[in-house]
């Protein structure tokens, strides 16, 4: 049986990335709260190659 989670960097970033978060009011709240908390990473990102 195939497992449910088949990770893909591109899909992860498109779904949970900065641009997607910036588009919706709720996503902007997420960014705002993570900035206020002082998070080093606001959203997911592809590691540098």
From Swiss-Prot:
Keywords: Ribonucleoprotein, Ribosomal protein. One of its GO terms (biological process) is translation. GO terms for cellular component: ribonucleoprotein complex; ribosome. InterPro entries: Ribosomal_bL34, Ribosomal_bL34_CS. It comes from the Bacteria. It holds the Pfam family Ribosomal_L34. The keyword Ribonucleoprotein applies. One of its GO terms (molecular function) is structural constituent of ribosome. Residues 1-49 are annotated as: Disordered. Residues 1-23, 31-49 have a biased composition (Basic residues). Belongs to the bacterial ribosomal protein bL34 family. PANTHER family: LARGE RIBOSOMAL SUBUNIT PROTEIN BL34M, MITOCHONDRIAL RIBOSOMAL PROTEIN 34 FAMILY MEMBER. This is Large ribosomal subunit protein bL34. It comes from Anaeromyxobacter dehalogenans (strain 2CP-C). The gene is rpmH.
């Amino acid at each position: 049986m195939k497992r449910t989670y088949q990770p893909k960097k591109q899909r992860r970033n498109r779904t949970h990335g900065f641009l997607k978060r910036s588009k919706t009011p709720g996503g902007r709240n997420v960014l705002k709260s993570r900035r206020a908390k002082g998070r080093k990473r606001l959203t997911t990102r592809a590691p540098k190659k």
